[in-house]
């Protein structure tokens, strides 16, 4: 029996060691490139620092009326870059380390509506500079106040009632000094519709000042057991008209004689823009009972007209 043998090729068995290692070297190189590529695609995350804001303070100057406020959140910026809007207390991550200029604005519910939150234009921001390091937690309690340029006119009821009856209605508006019905100080305003009666409409007959095109807000402390509206009675060429700015929901229940006080910021800018030629703007409040068997009780205090 004969076996056929292939001719012996010495070159196959005498390759240099470097050629034998080529596949292994290629594998290692490819692996390194893949790992480096992962670092490029998914770079190592920065280690953040944190800004902790547990609360805030607010104070109006002596000539700016009450320090009552309804600030609901803070708008936070680092070097003019927004970090977000936060309810308090808040722990806020900061990725850009080093020296940072922190600016914090006070936010409110415009017209008392949760879905229309804004930076209140008349509250000055809180500013500070921090040197920020990774894992560091800096605690800030921002202090807010009105801008000095804000033009503020406040009316309370310490000196008596300034609302007068207008039109045909059978409600009443007076002043209460009963301690458990007064918001602050010694007196608050009290609107009342007795059982079986149907309508309250009262106005402040002082013309309210504002500059066209500027922000215009009415701040107010209130308690009510019935829906009521706030707006302007305008006079143009001897013709008067009633312009609703906001319809306000009840804050209390039952007969409303135990007030549940709230603070609201009412944006009057839009209403005023609809009446650019009016000579007079008089603030009014109005209410119609939802239930004729339940008396209506509306308590007001610190009506603050704020503009520039």
What are these regions (language model features)?
Residues 217, 221-269:
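Extracellular ligand-binding interfaces
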Residues 34-37:
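C-terminal motif of bacterial Sec signal peptides marking the signal peptidase cleavage site
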Residues 157-158, 204-228, 266, 303:
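Extra-cytoplasmic beta-strand recognition segments
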Residues 139-171, 298-304:
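Extracellular carbohydrate-recognition regions
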Residues 110-141:
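Structured interaction patches on ligand/partner-binding surfaces of diverse proteins
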Residues 78, 96-115:
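A short, solvent-exposed beta-strand micro-motif common in secreted/extracellular proteins
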Residues 220, 263-298, 303:
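Extracellular beta-strand ligand-recognition surfaces/modules
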Residues 173-200:
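Short carbohydrate-recognition loop motifs
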């Amino acid at each position: 029996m004969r076996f056929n043998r292939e001719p012996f090729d010495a070159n196959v068995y005498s390759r240099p060691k470097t050629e034998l290692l080529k596949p292994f070297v290629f594998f290692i190189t490819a692996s390194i490139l893949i790992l480096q590529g992962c670092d490029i695609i998914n770079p190592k995350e920065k280690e953040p620092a944190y800004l902790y804001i547990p609360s805030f303070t607010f104070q109006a100057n002596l000539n700016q009326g009450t320090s009552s406020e309804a600030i609901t959140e803070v708008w936070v910026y680092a070097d003019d870059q927004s970090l977000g809007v936060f309810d308090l207390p808040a722990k806020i991550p900061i990725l850009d380390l080093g020296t940072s200029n922190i600016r914090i604005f006070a936010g409110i519910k415009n017209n008392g509506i949760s879905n229309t939150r804004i930076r209140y234009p008349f509250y000055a921001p809180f500013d500070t500079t921090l040197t920020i390091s990774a894992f560091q937690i800096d605690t800030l309690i921002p202090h807010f106040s009105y801008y000095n340029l804000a033009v503020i006119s406040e009316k309370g009821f310490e000196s008596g009632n300034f609302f007068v009856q207008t039109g045909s209605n059978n409600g009443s508006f007076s002043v209460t000094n009963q301690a458990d019905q007064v918001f602050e100080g010694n007196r608050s305003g009290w609107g009342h519709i007795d059982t079986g009666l149907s309508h309250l409409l009262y106005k402040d007959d002082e013309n309210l000042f504002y500059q066209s095109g500027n922000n215009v807000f009415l701040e107010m402390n209130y308690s009510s057991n019935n829906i009521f509206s706030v707006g302007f009675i305008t006079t143009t060429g001897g013709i008067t008209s009633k312009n609703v700015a906001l319809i306000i929901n009840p804050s209390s229940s039952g007969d409303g004689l135990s007030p549940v006080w709230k603070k609201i910021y009412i944006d009057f800018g839009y209403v005023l823009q609809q009446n650019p030629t009016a000579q007079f703007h008089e603030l009014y409040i109005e209410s119609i009972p939802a239930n004729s068997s339940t008396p209506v009780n509306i308590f007001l205090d610190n009506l603050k007209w704020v503009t520039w």
